[in-house]
């Protein structure tokens, strides 16, 4: 195969792109290599088909093949099927990075597919997938010659590192994913990574300096929030690296790009004549529609106005189509919203640019749930419910680049029912948007959780009303729900969604955007954090890029909004009444590892009795003797703990090595200890048990064992064999 290979050196890694040999029937394709990882990216579109709806018909599929890591797919069916959460989130990252590149009016259904064919253990598959997809799109015949590059930045020992290894990321306090093109940033995903510091320094007491003993050593949890200036420094580094990589991509890929296809864009059917008519006759009605907070009501009002115009005498004379009228009404509405903000510095709902909508908070309103918080901000309302469980309740998952499975012990599930926006719709499995919003809230809250123990925490956010910023309402409600559940966190976390309007030299940054401003604005910028700093951020740009000056202004304006919200949340926190009666209890303690076998008992008899008697779940660690007891009743959990400790503190029974004290052929009398389906266990005179098989007891199949011998009865038996401390017995004298 004649492949054209381009090699590009980047910080901490080298990318290799192979063109022209694989997937040649696609409009664009590339075989991407980095280390031992190999990905195939392809781009296809329907040249003869255009969608009529007003959206970009772009689909991105990131697919991981189990064979890429020498694995079989998990589960009963040994074939890849439904994408996992990591695949879905990676598809979203690629989509959000490439979508702004497409021109307005592009209506050809387009699919970008990225397949992982080989995966190195320490591979950052998300950056690789985006860069592979960007290369495939660049060399395709779709006329988009914009070299998007994605990278990750970590912060290790206080220093920023571009494209860190997996091992380095395990020591990082920052996980920053940035994509951009040339000098413009397109998409940002950021979170801080918590760490635990050991405080074993000396402390000063009343009597002077005292050295810390082992019992004085404290483990201090750090959420590692970032200050705005620190984040800007990291983004400047990302921007510099992206600019260099983009230049390398242009130089390498431009000679290989296919000739531009002639693709028809959707025509602009708006009319200046209709626009002027709307301005003169319906401006007031459209402004009234803009102030409607519910999306469904606003949509109905605008449609009614369009129908009214389309049926007017002027429209009939000029032969205006309803579609042209409706599109022009939408255009006028968008420009009216933006002009109101840029010219009058106020918003459709009357707020100032930095003003947050009214907030109302209620906690623990569900009597039988472990904890809950109802967070309402304007016309956006989130009911966040917390459920606490044990280690057994954790979600098991497996990543392609990791050996074995891992456990997710903090889950945030975001649900967006259609009634939240006044619409009727299907109820089904969560979509990509719901997974993405839940993941963002999780990233914002997770660093602040202080102690896990054996606990599993699940937060479910039910969006009951939505008019923008529902994911940030989930963050606020989730932080309060954790407090209402008695979970120790370093601080409250608040989130706020920021917006941007840009026209020529003018721009306006909006705090706490509503749905209308999100739809007609140029940026969706969600930022969450504590009073100390930022814990998570997500940014999507519709402009095709964002300057650092505007980003800096947005970050500091978001800080003001976050501090305002935190003040209200702190007041609500002071009024929380924790429902101790319904919260599950957890006890973690240690016993001698050698006594674990006594807690389990023969065939698990002892531990089963404890579980049933005290209604608890028990997790035992044979290696270090750690015992975890969880249950819904605090008193029963404590009683189970005391019972286990009493067993472990008893004098250990002498365990006999039967091969040392018995020999085959020996005959003796033994007591029938227990009768089971397959025979009877006989207590041996010098310690230990032996099995007398059913075939050595009964004379025919219809005869029952307890018809021949009884528990507690002494019978004469003979040792037939000894194998690995197991004794097989026979009857010394067979009964008549």
Curated annotation (Swiss-Prot):
GO biological process: mRNA catabolic process; RNA processing
EC number: 2.7.7.8
Annotated Gene Ontology cellular component terms: cytosol
SMART domains given in the database record: KH, S1
An MF annotation (GO) of this entry: RNA binding
Location (main, coarse): cytoplasm
Subcellular localization, as worded in the UniProt entry: Cytoplasm
Catalytic activity line of the entry: RNA(n+1) + phosphate = RNA(n) + a ribonucleoside 5'-diphosphate
UniProt xrefs under NCBIfam families: PRK11824.1
Protein name per UniProt: Polyribonucleotide nucleotidyltransferase
Lineage, uppermost ranks: Bacteria, Pseudomonadati, Campylobacterota, Epsilonproteobacteria, Campylobacterales
Gene: pnp
